[in-house]
Amino acid sequence: MSSVIQVNLPQTSYNIIISPNSLGSVGRHLTSLNLEQKILVISNPEIFDYYGEIVINSLKQAGFKVFSHVIPAGETYKTLDSISKIYDTALKHRLERASTLLALGGGVIGDMTGFAAATWLRGINFIQVPTSLLAMVDASIGGKTGVNHPQGKNLIGAFYQPRLVLIDPIVLKTLPVREFRAGMAEVIKYGVIWNQGLFNQLERQKKLDSLDSINLETIQTIITQSCQAKVDVVSQDEKEAGLRAILNYGHTIGHALESLTGYREINHGEAVALGMVAAGKIAVKLGMWKEEMSQRQKNIIQKAALPVIVDYPLKSQAILESLQLDKKVKAGKVRFILPTDIGQVEIREGVPSEVITRVLEEIKM
């Protein structure tokens, strides 16, 4: 059972292929793109140990000349220094403009590989083979690439679209439970901002905390619906001039929490979950959303065993100050994405700081 979603943008188009056991046929899929021979696979040690051989063998069988570059796992390595090391490997193997960088891994690997592809020789081919749920439903789609700065997440980056996104849901079997739950945060986000049917489906599930609690057919449906939601938005607003900003639901406070904890204590999905809880509460206080809706969202987040309380010694003032460094700040005003109904949100500027502070105090231990 396979699904294909076409992404049509003003200057390019590509497919998202969602197909179980497709990792072993990555070479065949790339052959149809008429790529030049050289491919540099970028991964982290654990993912490369699991899937590097099957991907490289498939590429070689399809006639590609394959090299690899492994980056230590984690947000702390999502830096310009890591990008420079990718450039070194690209230079060593004489990658040219017609060559390809292939991201085999989660969101961190995808973001860095895409940024390296966008900037090496002013742009070479880029392929996404996401191995985490978060990367499958979010990070691999839409062309956002980049690295972190010590003072903020993804402050250095570029929009650069892949030639193909190949998703094999089977690889989720080796994904750590905590990372699976992190991906569910982005899935829940799509239900709140765009797809009421997806939200209702998540509500019907008894648990969302591991692959053991969701059968393969259901997880593939959830992945497909999530990808389609993101494609619907990105197709209308590729470079975040307006509508695409709604994809940042939960990310405003979420990014601040990640930054203030040094990208170590809390992962991206956990931060987004907390950000969604906060955004829901802000919307209620502003009279935009009903308390009942906020509680329904919170219940789904808890089904995924994601946090709804900030269990870290952070001061509300520090979080407020970090919000000012968010890349979505416009004319000095923090922009929040706030829900008005299930499947609908608004972009709101100028939320009173006292409202934000009150909500931050409510979600802290």
Swiss-Prot record:
Subcellular location: Cytoplasm
Keywords: Amino-acid biosynthesis, Aromatic amino acid biosynthesis, Cobalt, Cytoplasm, Lyase, Metal-binding, NAD, Nucleotide-binding, Zinc
Molecular function terms from GO: 3-dehydroquinate synthase activity; metal ion binding; nucleotide binding
Pathway(s) the chain acts in: Metabolic intermediate biosynthesis; chorismate biosynthesis; chorismate from D-erythrose 4-phosphate and phosphoenolpyruvate: step 2/7
Reaction(s) catalysed by this chain's protein: 7-phospho-2-dehydro-3-deoxy-D-arabino-heptonate = 3-dehydroquinate + phosphate
GO biological process: amino acid biosynthetic process; aromatic amino acid family biosynthetic process; chorismate biosynthetic process
Primary localization: cytoplasm
Entry cofactors: Co(2+); Zn(2+); NAD(+)
SUPFAM superfamilies: Dehydroquinate synthase-like (SSF56796)
Entry keyword annotation includes Cytoplasm: yes
Binding site for Zn(2+): E186, H251, H268
Function: Catalyzes the conversion of 3-deoxy-D-arabino-heptulosonate 7-phosphate (DAHP) to dehydroquinate (DHQ).
Stated name of the protein: 3-dehydroquinate synthase
Lineage of the species this protein comes from: Bacteria, Bacillati, Cyanobacteriota, Cyanophyceae, Oscillatoriophycideae
